[in-house]
């Protein structure tokens, strides 16, 4: 079983299926290798926070507006860019407007091409990934990390446990805990050195491990081992095609 979500192995284990036969997988959008990741991060707008996706309840874009309110009340200098459209758009704009944040601190940029989204990721210092357990993977996380963003990611989304090592290449928070999300965003706004460190480590995570090239090579090695009847559980220590063990729903402890 190739698990394109960190929760897949655990879901199947509940039915007694694929014991020790689950391997980590994922979605692999285009990987961009920049001439200098240091130069890219240096050019980023450190006070710019980006969110991208459909405006749906299980993606929790409203949590971003709530964080914006708290940042504003705390006197933080910031700008949030929201890319996307969806059923919550009117509600979100109303929330931002009522808080006096619309256009000043929170901008809604509408839908745009994947290429344009990547340009915004390359410019933003921080990226918020707020989806809950209904997000099977979330390829925007790969893209934001590839773009050198310091990510703050919900622990509940399927990609987060595989891609984000909390405190090393990004931050993880408990889905729905707005105060925790706010605290981690504010810490990054106030500590640009941490932004740089997380962003560079995130970039290396994607370019050196979690990408299509590595996944394809490892898939061939894994397939050959399985066809030969070889124990493949220790073939790779981590990353694509490494053994995927059942993950507890409450795996993330702050």
Predicted regions, residues:
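Nucleotide-activated donor-binding/catalytic signature segment of Leloir-type glycosyltransferases, i.e.
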Residues: 93-112
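Short hydrophobic beta-strand element within catalytic cores of glycosyltransferases
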Residues: 150-154
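Donor nucleotide-sugar binding/catalytic pocket of nucleotide-sugar-dependent glycosyltransferases
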Residues: 1-48
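A short, well-ordered alpha-helix in the C-terminal region of glycosyltransferases
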Residues: 72, 180, 187, 194-209, ...
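Conserved donor-binding/catalytic core segment of Leloir-type glycosyltransferases
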Residues: 38-70, 81
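Conserved acidic donor-binding segment of nucleotide-sugar-dependent glycosyltransferases
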Residues: 166-167, 171-178, 187-192
């Amino acid at each position: 079983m190739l698990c394109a979500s960190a929760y897949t192995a655990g879901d199947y284990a509940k039915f007694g299926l694929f014991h020790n036969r689950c391997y980590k997988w994922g979605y692999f959008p285009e990987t961009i290798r920049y001439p200098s990741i240091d130069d890219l991060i240096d050019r980023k707008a450190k006070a710019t926070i980006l969110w991208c996706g459909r405006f749906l309840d299980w993606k929790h874009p409203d949590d971003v507006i709530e964080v914006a309110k708290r940042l504003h009340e705390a006197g933080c200098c910031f700008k949030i860019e929201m890319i996307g459209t969806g059923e919550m758009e009117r509600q979100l704009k109303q929330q931002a407007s009522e808080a006096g944040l619309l256009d000043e601190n929170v901008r809604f940029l509408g839908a745009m091409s994947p290429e344009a989204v990547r340009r915004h990721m390359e410019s933003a210092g921080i990226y918020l990934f707020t989806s809950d357990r209904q997000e099977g993977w979330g390829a925007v996380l790969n893209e934001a990390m590839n773009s050198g963003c310091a990510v703050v990611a919900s622990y509940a989304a399927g990609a987060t446990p595989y891609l984000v090592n909390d405190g090393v290449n990004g931050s993880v928070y408990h889905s729905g805990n707005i105060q925790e999300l706010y605290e981690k965003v504010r810490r990054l706004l106030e500590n640009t050195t941490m932004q740089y460190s997380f962003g560079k480590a995130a970039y290396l995570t994607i370019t050196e491990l979690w990408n299509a090239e590595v996944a394809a090579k490892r898939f061939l090695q894994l397939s050959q081992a399985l066809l030969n009847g070889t124990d493949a559980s220790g073939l790779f220590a981590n990353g694509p095609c490494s053994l995927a063990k059942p993950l507890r729903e409450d795996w993330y402890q702050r």
